[in-house]
From Swiss-Prot:
Provenance organism: Azoarcus sp. (strain BH72)
General function of this protein: Dual-specificity methyltransferase that catalyzes the formation of 5-methyluridine at position 54 (m5U54) in all tRNAs, and that of position 341 (m5U341) in tmRNA (transfer-mRNA).
Transferase among keywords: yes
NCBIfam families cross-referenced by the UniProt entry: trmA_only
Organism lineage: Bacteria, Pseudomonadati, Pseudomonadota, Betaproteobacteria, Rhodocyclales
A Gene Ontology term for the protein's cellular component: cytosol
Alphabetical list of PANTHER family matching this protein: TRNA/TMRNA (URACIL-C(5))-METHYLTRANSFERASE, TRNA_TMRNA (URACIL-C(5))-METHYLTRANSFERASE
GO term, biological process aspect, one: tRNA methylation
HAMAP family reported in the protein's UniProt record: RNA_methyltr_TrmA
Name recorded for this polypeptide: tRNA/tmRNA (uracil-C(5))-methyltransferase
Family of this protein: Belongs to the class I-like SAM-binding methyltransferase superfamily. RNA M5U methyltransferase family. TrmA subfamily.
Residues involved in S-adenosyl-L-methionine binding: 186, 214, 219, 235, 295
Active site: 320 (nucleophile), 354 (proton acceptor)
Annotated keywords: Methyltransferase, S-adenosyl-L-methionine, Transferase, tRNA processing
Length: 364
């Protein structure tokens, strides 16, 4: 696969091809007509990273084409990048080129932006960072008005903070999310907001309680929690759990219990398996679970989690891999059918498609 071309004139054509493939692949599973949620055709990506190419005193941003991975493709800009990233790229390059402490052995640059306009830049080096780097970096951060981090092997220098704060309006609420450097956050902010709206619409009227697996930094948790009595949310990443606690407090969400456990562990606990230390103080018998929400990694749900899912009347499933979503739905066909479906174009001009389904229990 080659590097994507970012041509707005081709946007609808490339999206139509992905939707057609989704509908064809899922037709044997009785897929209803999916809602389609489009991305902005340009400046949609809130995360980006680039290698830095040094040549005769000049620095350039570089990407690598999977079709020719050893040859760098030098770029002046990145049309997919969100506006704060696109505006910062040329300024950063010129300022770093003019500063020997910032330029020397700079290997990679990583950007993390928000819909609300914040920007964090991580500069990654192949050398230890010393006092001269920090002094130059503080000048750069102040001049550009960004959060700046320096990293090298076994070293990380955070000038102010290693996170940005996302804020946006959703169904009459202003939501706030801490997004930590190096932790997962949704790359396409506009499409993410559409996913939250769709998920809330499917969850309305569910009542009872919610079990959420793979909750990350609480992206969906914060949006969905007001629609349920109580929520039990699980996540394995320590940094994501910290961010989730921050985000729940920042949004005044007080009906969520977070536990750092893998999906197979919570499946075992709910099935009456062994006692887990991290579940101490949590009264599982006090929950009336009616809905399961999952947003798993590309590998999808394991067998234990599929077995757990069978016990729920409603399963809300967001997937970044249609193939494993297909396999999981096929495994649940004896108990659940697809009541609603959606396609989210998180990654325009690529073959990737984010999908959402609501599965409703059809048999005891």
């Amino acid at each position: 696969m080659s590097l994507p071309r970012f041509d707005p004139a081709e946007y609808e054509t490339q999206l139509a091809a992905k939707i057609a493939r989704f509908k064809s692949d899922f037709a044997p599973l009785d897929l209803p007509e999916p809602e389609v949620f489009r991305s902005e055709p340009l400046h949609y990506r809130l995360r980006a990273e680039f290698r830095i190419w040094h040549s005769e005193g000049r620095l350039d941003y570089a990407m690598f084409d999977p079709a020719d991975p050893k040859r760098p493709v030098l770029i002046d800009g990145f049309p997919a990048a969100a506006a704060p990233i696109a505006a910062a790229m040329p300024v950063l390059r010129e300022r770093v080129m003019a500063s020997e402490p910032l330029r020397r052995k700079l290997f990679q640059v990583e950007f993390l932006a928000t819909l609300s306009g914040e920007l964090m830049i991580s500069l990654v080096y192949h050398r230890p960072l010393e006092a001269d780097w920090e002094a130059a970096a503080r000048e750069l951060a102040a001049a550009m008005g960004v959060q700046l981090i320096g990293r090298s092997r076994k070293q990380k220098i955070v000038l102010e903070r290693d996170w940005v704060l996302e804020s946006f309006e959703l169904d009459g609420r202003t939501l706030h999310y801490q997004q930590i450097e190096g932790s997962f956050s949704q790359p396409n902010g506009g499409v993410n907001r559409q996913m939250l709206v769709w998920a809330r619409r499917q969850a309305e009227g569910s009542g009872a309680d919610l079990l959420e697996l793979y909750c990350g930094n609480g992206n969906f948790t914060v949006a969905l929690a007001p629609l349920f009595g109580k929520v039990l949310a699980t996540e394995m990443s320590k940094s994501s759990v910290r961010a989730a606690h921050y985000n729940l407090a920042a949004n005044a969400v007080d009906n969520v219990t977070m536990v750092r456990m893998a999906s197979e562990e919570i499946s075992d606990a709910l099935a009456g398996g062994r006692a887990y230390r991290r579940m101490q103080g949590i009264d599982l018998a006090g929950y009336r679970f009616g809905t399961l929400f999952v947003d798993p990694p590309r590998s999808g749900l394991d067998e234990a989690t599929v077995a757990l899912a069978r016990r729920f009347d409603r399963i809300l499933y967001i997937s970044c891999n249609p193939q494993t979503l297909h396999d999981n739905i096929a495994a649940l066909r004896d108990t659940h059918g697809i009541a609603a479906a959606a396609a989210f174009d998180q990654f325009p001009y690529t073959h990737h498609l984010e999908c959402g389904v609501l599965l409703q229990k059809t048999a005891a």
